[in-house]
């Protein structure tokens, strides 16, 4: 059968070769819609650092804040950060959250009822002071799922990649030999490969864009420039007590800027 006829009959496209569970949700944005754009990653329960950063950058409703995954685990105020993010969204702030591998594990726990064992490593209440105020066993039986239903729904709707006019944001990394829609889920969530080194197979669409990722912590507490246009912005907040932020757009000035807060 002629390939073009095959495509028309079966509505074939490249994505159909990718198993559903491995498909990556890509959200495309117009960066011209925002006055300033900020990116942070891997908060890991460091709620106080998050508040310090919001105060320092003086986020406005005309701006955009991207969080590149891994709000939860390690630190003691994971759930508080999620609640703060949702409150900001409801108040009209532009905040986009990209799924991290720790959120992916959290969702898997809920799919398999692992939260019923509240001592599991990634249980939402083991990593949040919010739930320490409750009688866990009693609360579990009465309204646990009702209380966190909003969070699970929100996380399920989050993209794994956000692509703008000049910038790409992802949690762990990319395969630069594949376009965004053909990235593998496990790779964008988990990779620690030095993907920026594969210059020979890099597609043209990546050559003129900055790429920002997290997942692999910089234990000196600083943002790391991996190549001309690729940055690791995970400053290891839980370990270093330092949170780095990249201002990737400011309509009043040119270039990018690193911003830090400490506690």
What are these regions (language model features)?
Residues 2-84:
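N-terminal active-site segment of His-dependent metallophosphoesterases
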Residues 36-44, 167-173, 231-233:
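Active-site-proximal beta-strand elements of phosphoester/diester hydrolases
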Residues 39, 65-67, 97-98, 168, ...:
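Residue-level marker for buried hydrophobic side chains located in beta-strands
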Residues 42, 70, 85, 100-101, ...:
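Divalent metal-coordination and catalytic microenvironments
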Residues 44-49, 73-76, 102-107, 176-177, ...:
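Active-site environment of divalent metal-dependent phosphoester hydrolases
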Residues 74-163, 191-198:
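Active-site neighborhood of divalent metal-dependent phosphoester bond hydrolases
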Residues 141-221:
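His/acidic metal-ligating clusters that form di-metal
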Residues 188-261:
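Conserved beta-sheet core of the metallophosphoesterase superfamily
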